[in-house]
Amino acid sequence: MAEIDDYILDVLMRDLVGHDRRPVSFLVYLWLSAEEARRGEAVEVSYQELAECIGISKSSAQVAVGWLNKRQLLTTKKGTVTATPRYTVNRPWRDAKLRLERKGRAAR
């Protein structure tokens, strides 16, 4: 079973579901995060497969991915326009924490 970062449940869920009113975006983020952890690499999956795995419509998956990209919580890459997207889950709170730790070490 994939581990869920505390930040995802404590902060991100409220932000996406409550503030942004995008619960499907939270489900997509959660599923992609778990799948990336299982595979150990970015997740290559079509909108249709993504939708079926989560139990949502294809158009809802497309909108959710677009929102997550806009929020910079997801990076999407495609080799060609018609290629299957490859998703990398971004965790900006971890990056910020690392920057602060490095800054603290450099100041010593």
Give residue ranges: language-model regions.
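Short recognition helix of helix-turn-helix/winged-helix DNA-binding domains
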Residues: 1-53, 82, 107
